[in-house]
Amino acid sequence: LLEGVTVRYRVPKEVVSSIKEYAIRRLQGRIEHDELVALRGVSLRVAPGERVGVVGPNGAGKSTLMKVIARVCRPSKGRVVVRGRVAPLLQLGIGFHQELSGRENVVLQGTLLGRSRREMEARMAAIAQFAEIEGFLDAPIRTYSTGMGARLAFATATDVDPDILLIDEALSVGDERFVAKCRDRMAGFRERGKTFFLVSHSLSEVEKTCHRAIWLLDGEVVADGDPEEVCARYRAWARRGDEVSG
């Protein structure tokens, strides 16, 4: 449940060349800021078991919305009520410690999501198999490719069986075969009445996976409803923009 949620950020007007220069300017009161509004009065009610796609151009507020639901970002105004365990896949590799091994990161992420160390160790082989990284589990995350990190993040987050799963473009780096595996796992989520949000620039993916879609533009909800209808409106808007810019 989100009621009138607004998120504002303060961003410096000028780019400084170093942390030292920034600190000096700040102490001297010479840093001026602009206010960036990422979300503007967003209200949503999502029932358990809903599969919600979130679409919109870059900078529309999609990732900020996910961060608010994940309690990573606190709203400047409004109310947020989230019931149940949330597993966020907000950015590729977010939350992973680069110097720790894949195994250590799985245990760490699992405990942060409410599982015990023993439970995560017991599930380790299954997680590594799903992520297709069995031979690399004890290597540092910094040695992983982007795709390997994304697969491990998805496998870990979905294995802990959260009530709410947030996916922000985390599948965009996977090959079609792995994406199909992810779809199958998300279908299992649906059958068990779990809720998930899918942020994607692939409108066809949203249409195939979700039964509700939200279109964000400049931090506001432009449309909320049937995925095919919402995506059709968004496509038409995007085409008009291309015609104007061309």
Show where each model-derived region lies.
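Conserved catalytic segment of ABC-fold P-loop ATPases
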Residues: 208-215
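Conserved ABC ATPase "signature" C-loop
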Residues: 218-219, 234
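The feature captures the beta-strand-to-loop junction immediately N-terminal to the Walker
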Residues: 55-57
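Conserved ABC ATPase "signature" region
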Residues: 20-28, 107, 119-136, 155
